[in-house]
Amino acid sequence: MPRPNHALISTMDSTTQPGDADLRDEYAALRERAILLEEQTPPLLQRISDVLPRISGESELADEHRERLVGARNAAMVSIENYQQAIPFLQTADSIIEQLDKTPERDEDIEWRESLLQRLDELIDVAVVMINDAEDYFDQAQACDLANVPKSILED
């Protein structure tokens, strides 16, 4: 299933002072990437875990495929761990956006809003790293094509 290329999503740091709309756009894209990982990674892990114990025998071929699937299973588990670590940062970002939405823009609140936007930027920066890592590990796990496991080494 195609996923957006995270390399195309610019990451801002605290020195760029992005605007409210830029941060919301970046957050929305990041949230979508996290949702895709949450939808795709556990089923991939399950498919790998279903095939792995079916590899039978002590042949070089069986050992090679077993090792490949163990690596893919580990990559899928690390992917899940990474996107789950990003969840608290995304939830906090949600709360900040809610605060910004509930509070009308007034001149006397400019410093407060700017501090919230800076905090939102920092949260996004941290979560981007975790989601990037999760996607990289997901790609590694997905690269292990289960269809390439020869039927001759699988138990029914």
Regions found by a protein language model. Give the residues of each.
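N-terminal amphipathic/basic-hydrophobic helices that include classical n-h-c signal peptides
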Residues: 1-10
